[in-house]
């Protein structure tokens, strides 16, 4: 029975369970509020810790907060240099010019060492500054190379040559056609003119003049050029000069004589001006420092024949006083007169005497013309257009040379004045070799090779 009771339960215990359940549902559902209010409140209490343990925990917390702050600052500093700068697009030329980039880097490193380090700036400003620096370095390097290879042609050699050159006007035409007259003319220019004037003087000279004469001045004539030649036919100048087809009515030309130094120029202008050579009064003047035109001592002569010569004016105005020079204005293409001239006297009082010859005939006969004589006036030339050369690029010294060259040099040199010349190396000439290379020796005449070649030639000849 006990096994059955264990399996199916005891009848007594079932009765007790039913009684307890019945008692539970039989009780009233109303809750007594007094009991609830009088019930004590339960409070959970934490276990107490020691004071030493609390202090250690506080120290660890403060140390952890400090270490976290330091780590954050280090991370921020590492992140700033790690930021990549924006790469700007560069031209193909900059990528190709490795030398320019290398020089810019070297210059940048040297500047960074000298200058103190500043605070880091924005990435955009750094990239812009680098681009500007590379552009400036590139322009400076390439600019110096290109500018150093070009030079402005200021004709400095021609200006130095003009300092040693004298102008000789009213030279007889026979100098070109006759060798004898040419030798006499060259002898006149290469001789000291002061020796001839000493014979005519009374012998009373100042000490300064004696000291100047004792100085050794060499009158070495390097070259003589003839200009203002009038030809009879309209042929090229070289062809007409070779055939000597000169104009019959024009019996005078102009010449330029170049000396070895500038010392004889002043002496020749002083003593040779107005000298008679083959019945012609020579007019000698310096090329770089010509004698000024004085309006008070000169007269204007108009209504001249186009074929008029200087000697007729010398003879016509010689009774008025000592003449310094006679200048007939001529055409640059035909080298014939334009119909007017200037006569300058040594004394201004001779001008009043020359004015009395107004409307008087210079020649007798059919070709006689009444001259129109008047005082000279200073007529300033209208300034032409400025040259195409940019004077802003030139310094003061170059501008002075340019201005002198325009007044002194001829047409051919003035046309090439101010051009940019590229500097080139010297061309190789025959016989010039480098010192490293050894010249090959000539073949010996008694050697084996020469003997065999001679024997071979004899065999073929037979």
Swiss-Prot record:
Chain residue ranges for the region called Disordered: 24-148, 191-215, 381-400, 432-462
Gene Ontology, cellular component aspect: nucleolus
Primary gene name: NOP12
GO MF, one example: rRNA binding
Biased composition (Acidic residues): 47-59, 125-134, 198-211
Sequence ranges of Basic and acidic residues compositional bias: 108-124
Subcellular location, record wording: Nucleus, Nucleolus
Keyword Nucleus: yes
Recorded family membership: Belongs to the RRM RBM34 family.
Stated role: Involved in pre-25S rRNA processing.
UniProt xrefs under PROSITE patterns: RRM (PS50102)
Domain RRM: 297-378
Compositional bias ranges of the Basic residues kind: 438-455
The entry's keywords: Nucleus, Ribosome biogenesis, RNA-binding, rRNA processing
Composition-biased stretches (Polar residues): 137-146, 383-397
Pfam family, one: RRM_1
Organism: Kluyveromyces lactis (strain ATCC 8585 / CBS 2359 / DSM 70799 / NBRC 1267 / NRRL Y-1140 / WM37) (Yeast)
GO biological process, one term: maturation of LSU-rRNA from tricistronic rRNA transcript (SSU-rRNA, 5.8S rRNA, LSU-rRNA)
InterPro entries on file: Nucleotide-bd_a/b_plait_sf, RBD_domain_sf, RRM2_Nop12p-like, RRM_dom
Name the record gives this protein: Nucleolar protein 12
């Amino acid at each position: 029975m006990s096994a059955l009771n264990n399996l199916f339960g005891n009848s007594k215990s079932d009765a007790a369970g039913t009684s307890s359940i019945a008692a539970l549902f039989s009780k009233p559902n109303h809750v007594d509020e007094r009991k609830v209010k009088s019930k004590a409140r339960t409070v959970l209490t934490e276990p107490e810790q020691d004071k030493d343990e609390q202090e250690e925990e506080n120290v660890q917390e403060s140390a952890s907060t400090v270490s976290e702050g330091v780590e954050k600052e280090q991370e921020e500093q590492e992140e700033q240099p790690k930021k990549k700068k924006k790469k700007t697009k560069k031209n193909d030329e900059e990528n190709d010019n490795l030398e320019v980039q290398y020089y810019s880097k070297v210059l940048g490193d040297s500047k960074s060492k000298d200058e103190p380090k500043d605070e880091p700036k924005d990435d955009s400003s750094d990239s812009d500054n680098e681009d500007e620096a590379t552009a400036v370095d590139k322009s400076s390097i390439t600019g110096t190379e290109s500018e150093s290879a070009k030079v402005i042609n200021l004709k400095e050699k021609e200006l130095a040559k003009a300092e040693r050159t004298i102008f000789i006007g009213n030279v007889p035409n026979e100098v070109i056609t006759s060798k004898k007259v040419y030798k006499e003319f060259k002898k006149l220019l290469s001789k000291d003119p002061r020796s001839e004037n000493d014979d005519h003087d009374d012998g009373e000279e100042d000490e300064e003049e004696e000291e100047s004469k004792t100085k050794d001045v060499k009158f070495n004539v390097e070259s003589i050029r003839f200009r203002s030649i009038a030809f009879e036919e309209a042929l090229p100048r070289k062809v007409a000069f070779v055939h000597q087809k000169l104009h019959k009515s024009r019996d005078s030309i102009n010449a330029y004589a170049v000396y070895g130094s500038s010392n004889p120029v002043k002496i020749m202008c002083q003593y040779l001006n107005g000298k008679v050579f083959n019945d012609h009064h020579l007019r000698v003047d310096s090329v770089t420092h010509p004698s000024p035109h004085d309006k008070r001592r000169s007269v204007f002569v108009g209504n001249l024949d186009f074929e008029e010569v200087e000697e007729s004016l010398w003879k016509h105005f010689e009774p008025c006083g000592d003449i310094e020079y006679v200048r007939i204005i001529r055409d640059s293409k035909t080298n014939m007169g334009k119909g007017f001239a200037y006569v300058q006297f040594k004394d201004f009082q001779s001008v009043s005497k020359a004015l009395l010859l107004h409307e008087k005939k210079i020649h007798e006969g059919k070709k006689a013309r009444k001259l129109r004589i008047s005082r000279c006036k200073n007529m300033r030339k209208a300034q032409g257009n400025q040259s195409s050369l940019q004077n802003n690029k030139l310094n003061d010294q170059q501008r002075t040379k340019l201005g002198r060259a325009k007044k002194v040099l001829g047409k051919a040199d003035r046309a090439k004045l101010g051009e940019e010349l590229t500097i080139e190396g010297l061309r190789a000439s025959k016989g010039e070799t480098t010192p490293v290379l050894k010249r090959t020796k000539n073949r010996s005449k008694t050697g084996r090779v020469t003997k065999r070649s001679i024997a071979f030639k004899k065999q073929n000849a037979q």
